[in-house]
A protein has these predicted regions:
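Bacterial N-terminal signal peptides that target proteins for export
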Residues: 2-11
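C-terminal motif of bacterial Sec signal peptides marking the signal peptidase cleavage site
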Residues: 20-22
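Extended, loop-rich substrate-binding clefts of extracytoplasmic carbohydrate-active enzymes
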Residues: 27, 34-37, 45, 129-206, ...
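Short, Gly/Pro- and small/polar-rich lid/capping loops
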Residues: 28-60
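A contiguous, surface-exposed recognition patch within enzymatic or periplasmic domains that forms
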Residues: 53-66, 70-128, 218-378, 393-404
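Short, hydrophobic/aromatic-enriched beta-strand segments in well-ordered soluble domains
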Residues: 70, 164, 182-184, 378-391
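Hydrophobic beta-strand positions in extracellular immunoglobulin-like domains
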Residues: 214-215, 386
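Short peripheral tails and domain-boundary helices/loops at the edges of structured domains
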Residues: 401-415
C-alpha cells in the first residue's frame, strides 16, 4: 500500500483529467444533460456532474464506462455498456438529490455499487446506540458511509483507489477505529470473460468492473467477540422492471449440515408468487412493487448471483468472495440473536412502506465479508465484481446457462 501514497499530492488533478469539467457551470451541465433522454448514461453523467467532480473509467472504445464519486462515499453510481446514449444501469435517486435535505437515518442517493459496514442490527450493530430499542426511529447510518466525502489516492483511465479513515460505535459501546481502502477497476472485455471463465461473445455488449475493499484495524486492541466487530457489506442498487428477476444459485445439502436454504422473512414471509426455489436456484421477483429481502448463509451461498431484465435485454452477474469456514455476522434488528450466525449474501426488492412512501424503487444484490476479528494493524479484504451483459436473448441465454446454471426460458417461466 505504500505506493498509494505517492498519488495523494495530485489526485484531484488526475480525477479532473478524466472527466467533464463540472466547474464549467450549471448552464452547460443542463444543456448537455437534456441532450440525452432520462434513463441514459449521458443524462446521469451530466446530472451527477453538477453534484461532484466525477471520476469516469472508460474502456478502449468508450462503450463501457462507469461513474465513481469520491464525494459520495466512493460509490460506483452507474455504468453503461453502450456509451453515452446507452441505458444507465445503476439506480440514481434524483428525488433525494433534488430535495437538498440531509436525512438523519440514511441518505439514499443510489449507486450500483456502494461500500457499507455491517452489522446493521443485533448485538454488534453500528447503526444503533447502546441500549436503545432496535427500531427505525433509532436507526442511523454511520456518517462516513452515508454523507462524508472520501479521499482519492489514485485515479487512472481504468482504475481508481479511494480511502477513508473512520470511527464507528457499536451497540456494546465500543468505539472502533478503522481505515478503508477501496480499489475500483474497469475490466476490459477479455479480462472480464477470463475472470468468469467463459468464452467471449462478440454479439454482446459488456461493462464490467472489480472492487477490492479492505478494512484495517487502527485501534490498539484486538476486535473480538467481547468488543464486538464489523464486516464489509457491499450493496448493488439496480433499476427494477416489471419482469426482472434475481437468480441466486445455492449449494445443495441437508439442512442439518448446511442450514436452511434461504432466510426469507426479514420483512415478513415473501409470497410464493414472488419467491421460488427450483432445482438449485432461488428466484426473486424484482419489480420494485413489494418490499422483500432474503439471505443465504456461507454454506449455502455460491460466489455468484444474477439479475435478468428482458425488457432492457440486460443480464447482470455479480461475483464475490464466500468463505465456507468463516464466521458471518447476524444483521437482524434483534440483539437477542446470536451475533455470530448470519448471511454471506442477500437480495432485496424495494416496494412501498405501509404509509405508501418508497425510497426507490430499486433492487439490490448484496455480499458480505466474514467477521473482521482483527488484531491492531491487520486488514480484511472483500472482493465484489459486477458484469452487465446487453444483447439478444439467445446470446444472454448462453451466459445464464454457463454461469447461473439456468436458461432464460426457465427464468421467464418462474412467475
Amino acid at each position: 500500500m505504500k505506493n498509494l501514497r505517492t498519488a495523494i499530492a495530485f489526485p484531484f488533478l488526475l480525477a479532473a483529467c478524466l472527466l467533464l469539467p463540472a466547474c464549467g457551470g450549471n448552464t452547460k451541465k443542463d444543456k448537455n444533460m437534456h441532450a440525452f433522454e432520462k434513463g441514459t448514461f449521458g443524462y446521469d453523467l451530466y446530472y451527477l456532474s453538477g453534484k461532484d467532480s466525477l471520476i469516469v473509467l472508460k474502456g478502449e472504445n468508450g462503450n463501457a464506462q462507469i461513474i465513481v464519486s469520491a464525494k459520495y462515499q466512493g460509490k460506483v453510481f452507474t455504468s453503461t455498456a453502450t456509451g453515452l446514449s446507452g441505458k444507465s444501469l445503476g439506480f440514481v435517486n434524483y428525488k433525494v438529490f433534488d430535495s437538498g435535505v440531509i436525512d438523519e437515518h440514511m441518505n439514499g442517493y443510489g449507486g450500483e455499487n456502494r461500500f457499507w459496514l455491517g452489522p446493521e442490527g443485533g448485538k454488534y450493530s453500528v447503526y444503533f446506540e447502546p441500549g436503545v430499542e432496535q427500531v427505525f426511529d433509532n436507526w442511523h447510518t454511520p456518517k462516513p458511509i452515508d454523507i462524508e466525502a472520501w479521499n482519492i489516492l489514485f485515479s487512472g483511465e481504468k482504475e481508481t483507489i479511494l480511502e477513508k479513515a473512520m470511527q464507528v460505535n457499536n451497540y456494546l459501546g465500543t468505539a472502533l477505529h478503522l481505515n478503508v481502502i477501496r480499489k475500483i477497476t474497469l475490466l476490459e472485455r477479455d479480462a472480464a470473460y477470463r475472470m468468469l471463465g467463459i468464452a467471449a461473445n462478440p454479439n454482446l455488449n459488456l461493462v464490467a468492473y472489480s472492487t477490492n475493499n479492505t478494512i484495517f484495524n487502527k485501534d490498539d486492541f484486538e476486535w473480538t467477540s467481547q468488543t464486538g466487530t464489523i464486516c464489509i457489506w457491499m450493496l448493488d442498487m439496480f433499476n427494477p422492471a416489471p419482469r426482472a428477476v434475481t437468480i441466486i444459485p445455492f449449494v445443495e445439502g441437508k439442512e442439518k449440515e448446511s442450514g436452511k436454504i434461504v432466510t426469507s422473512d426479514y420483512f415478513g414471509e415473501i409470497p410464493a408468487d414472488r419467491l421460488s426455489i427450483q432445482g438449485n436456484a432461488i428466484y426473486l421477483k424484482t419489480d420494485g412493487n413489494y418490499r422483500s429481502k432474503l439471505g443465504l448463509n456461507e454454506k449455502r451461498a455460491k460466489e455468484i448471483a444474477g439479475n435478468y431484465d428482458p425488457d432492457s435485454q440486460r443480464l447482470t452477474i455479480t461475483t464475490f468472495n464466500v468463505d465456507k469456514n468463516a464466521v458471518y455476522l447476524n444483521q437482524e434488528w434483534n440483539p437477542a440473536k446470536d451475533p455470530l450466525k448470519g448471511d454471506a449474501m442477500n437480495a432485496y426488492n424495494d416496494g412501498p412502506l405501509a404509509d405508501g412512501s418508497i425510497m426507490g424503487p430499486f433492487l439490490e444484490v448484496e455480499s458480505v465479508s466474514p467477521a473482521a476479528f482483527l488484531k491492531p494493524g491487520q486488514g480484511l479484504s472483500h472482493i465484489h465484481n459486477v458484469f452487465h451483459f446487453i444483447g439478444e436473448e439467445a446470446d444472454l441465454n448462453l451466459v445464464a446457462q454457463q454461469l447461473l446454471g439456468v436458461s432464460i426460458e426457465e427464468i421467464m417461466n418462474i412467475f
